[in-house]
Amino acid sequence: MSSSDIFDVLNIQPKSSSPHPQTSQSNAGASKTPKPQVTGMQRELYNLLGDNTPPIVIQPTSKFKDRLASLTKPSPWTHTEFEATPYVKLSHWVKGSKELLEGQSPKSSFAKYDQKLTLPEFTEGEYQEFMAQAAKGANSDAPTWSYEEVQYLFDLCRRYDLRWHIVYDRYMYDESRTMEDIREMFYTVCQKYFQAKDPGNPLLPSLAYSKDQEIQRKKYLTRLLSRSAAEIAEEEALIMESRKFEMAAKKTLQEREAMLRLLDHPQGDANVSQFLTSQGMNQLYNNLLNDKQRRRKPDSAPPENPWMKQQQQFAQQKQQLQLQHQQHHQLRDQKRIEVKTDPVTPGSPKQDSPSPGRKASDQSAAPRMNKKQKLEMQTAMRRKQDSEYAQHLLKNFSSEERKSLGVTLHGEKLAPGVFLRSSKISTFKPSIQNKVVSVLQELGLPVRPAMPSAAVVQHHDELLRRIVTLLDLKRQQDKLEAEKAIVK
C-alpha cells in the first residue's frame, strides 16, 4: 500500500503539478535525485509515511546476533539407543556426531540413581549351618522355613526394595503367610546370618523384630482410627481437664515458693511438715501479714505541730455542735412519732423531761464521730423508725391474713415500682451460675420456678445458696486432694 492509496481512502486530493510547470520541473528534478537509503525500517512501512518523514530514523547498532551466527557453528545431535535395563532398550538425543558416538557404549544418565539394597546371600548349606547353630545356642525348637521359600522371600525383598506391602502382595509361595510372618522370618534370618559372620557387630540389636508388638500396634491404630465423634470429644475434654490440673498444680507450687521466699531466715528447729497442709500455709500467711503490718508502724511518734493541733480542736468543736443539733432534731422527731402511735391518756403520768444538766452531761459523754459514722448512724436510725412504723401497721394482721394478702415486711430496701418476684432470685458469677444450672438439671428442677409465689421463691433462693455452699466445699476438697497428690 502506497501513499496514494492512503490519500484515496481519506478522500484527500494530492497536489496537482499541471498548472505549475516550474514546480513540476522542480519535482521531477527532485525525483531524479537519489533518495538516501533508510535502514532499520521496512520499505512498505516507510512508504506509508508520505510527506511526513521522520527527522531521525532509529537504527539498531548492535550486531550481536549477526556476529554470533557468523562465529559459531551448530553442534550436531545424534539419535542413539541406550539400555534402560538389560531387557529394555530406548532411544534419546545425544549431543555429538554419529561417528564419535559409534564406538561408545551409551548408558542412561539416570543409572546412578538406580541403587539396590545389599541383602545377604547364602547357599543352602550355609543357611542350614547358621540356622542350626542359632537354634542350638538358643535351645529353641521353633519351626523354620525351607531354603527355597527363604530364597524366594529374599528375591522379592531385593526386587521391591523392602516395600513390605508390595512384597506381601506379590508373595505367592504360601498364601497363608501374613505380613508379620514374612517380616519376622526376614529379620530372623538376617540376624542369625550376621551373628554367625560377626557376633560383635553393634547393629545386631537393630534387626530384632517383635511380631506380637507389631500386631498390638496395628490393633491399637485400628481402634484409634475407628473412634466416633463422641469418643473424640470425650478424649479432648479429658485432655483439657488434665491440663487444668497441671496448671493448678504449677500455680500452687509457684505460690508456695513465693510464700517461702518471704521468710526472713530459715528456722532450723522448726518442722517443715507443718507447712505442707493448707491450714499450715494459711497460718504462715497470716503470721507474715501481721509481721509486715507491725514493721510498718513507726517506733516513735512524730513531733506535734501546734498549728495542726489547733485546727484539730476547731474541727472537734464543730463536730460537737453539729452532733448536738442533730440529736436535738432526732429527739423532736421521736417525740412526734410516739405521740402519733401511743397517745397519752388523761390519767397516765407524763414522762419526766430531761433536765438541762442531764442533757449537757449526756452530750458531753457522747463519743466523737466523723462524718461517715454520723451518716451511717442516721441511716440506721431511719431504718429502725421505718421498721417500727411498719410493725405497728401490721400488728393488727394475723399470719394467715398476711400470707393470703401477700403482705410482708422487708428488711432490705426495695426499688420503687412494680417488679416480679422471679427477678429477685439470686444470681451468681457466670462460672458459678453454669455449675448451679447443671446441679439443678441433675436434680430435675427448673432454673426458675414455674409458680413463683413468695414461699416458693424463698425456698428456691435458699436452695441456690446451699448449692453454692456445696460447690465451694467441693472446690476446696479438690484443691486439698491436688495438694496431697503434689506432696506424694
UniProtKB/Swiss-Prot annotation:
Domain of life of the organism encoding this protein: Eukaryota
GO MF term list: transcription corepressor activity
GO terms, biological process: chromatin remodeling; chromosome organization; DNA repair; negative regulation of transcription by RNA polymerase II
Domain SANT positions: 137-190
Compartments reported by the entry: Nucleus
Biased composition range(s): Low complexity: 309-325
Cellular component aspect of the GO annotation: NuA4 histone acetyltransferase complex; Swr1 complex
InterPro entries: DAMP1_SANT-like (IPR032563), Swc4/Dmap1 (IPR027109)
Protein family according to the UniProt entry: Belongs to the SWC4 family.
Subunit and interaction comment: Component of the SWR1 chromatin-remodeling complex and of the NuA4 histone acetyltransferase complex.
PANTHER family xref list: DNA METHYLTRANSFERASE 1-ASSOCIATED PROTEIN 1, DNA METHYLTRANSFERASE 1-ASSOCIATED PROTEIN 1 FAMILY MEMBER
Name of this chain's protein: SWR1-complex protein 4
Organism of provenance: Eremothecium gossypii (strain ATCC 10895 / CBS 109.51 / FGSC 9923 / NRRL Y-1056) (Yeast)
Protein's gene: SWC4
